[in-house]
Amino acid sequence: MPILRNDWNDVIGGEFQKTYYLELREFLKREYKEQTVYPHMNDLFNAFHYTPFEQVKVVILGQDPYHGPNQAHGLSFSVKPEVAVPPSLKNMYKELQDDLGVTPVDHGYLQPWADQGVLLLNTVLSVRKRQPGSHKGKGWELFTNEVIHALNKREEPVAFVLWGRHAQAKKEAIDATRHLIIESAHPSPFSANRGFFGSRPFSKINHWLQEQGKAPVDWQLPMKAELYSYGK
């Protein structure tokens, strides 16, 4: 059975046979056996499962998963519904409200965005508990670089959202003459006041999507009570 269960398998499924990925897989087997690692192994590729390749309209690039209990579930910036909204996501909600009048919600579960074609992609897809950056340089970056290359080559253009220096390092892999690139400071409390607040990324994305003849993203998330009927 393929690891990726939709059209992503045709696009990047070959990566799973490459030497770097086989080494990464052995590393992950050891880590999941000997350490507490997030997200759960079954959630590693959720970004791809929720947002098929041909449906990607927007990419919001993160770094590595949240490293606290019950937070990470395979989507960048998103957390499971039952845990507190992380500070960076709170700042994203604040900017959404200022930008588009979107009401902040009482959870951080972003799957409704993913279902609309927003690929919530971290450049590293796993992390040890309480050790940010602990799976950096193990092979994930090569894998997610291929994801970005595949989207860059695709005929249908994509809006790439690059917040902070880590994400902006990927800019050279993106053809800015074909795709939209949105850059600013990261929404982290350490940097949000240095150019994230007031950057209006969400309205820029929707304006561009409409110019492309595509439906805008409905950024308004359901409240937590409604999530259970949403089908989390």
UniProtKB/Swiss-Prot annotation:
It catalyses: Hydrolyzes single-stranded DNA or mismatched double-stranded DNA and polynucleotides, releasing free uracil. It holds the Pfam family UDG. GO terms for biological process: base-excision repair, AP site formation via deaminated base removal. InterPro entries: UDG_fam1, Ura-DNA_Glyclase_AS, Uracil-DNA_glycosylase-like, Uracil-DNA_glycosylase-like_sf. CDD domains: UDG-F1-like (cd10027). The active site is at 64 (proton acceptor). It is found in: Cytoplasm. GO terms for cellular component: cytoplasm. Keywords: Cytoplasm, DNA damage, DNA repair, Hydrolase. Excises uracil residues from the DNA which can arise as a result of misincorporation of dUMP residues by DNA polymerase or due to deamination of cytosine. This is Uracil-DNA glycosylase. It comes from Shouchella clausii (strain KSM-K16). The gene is ung.
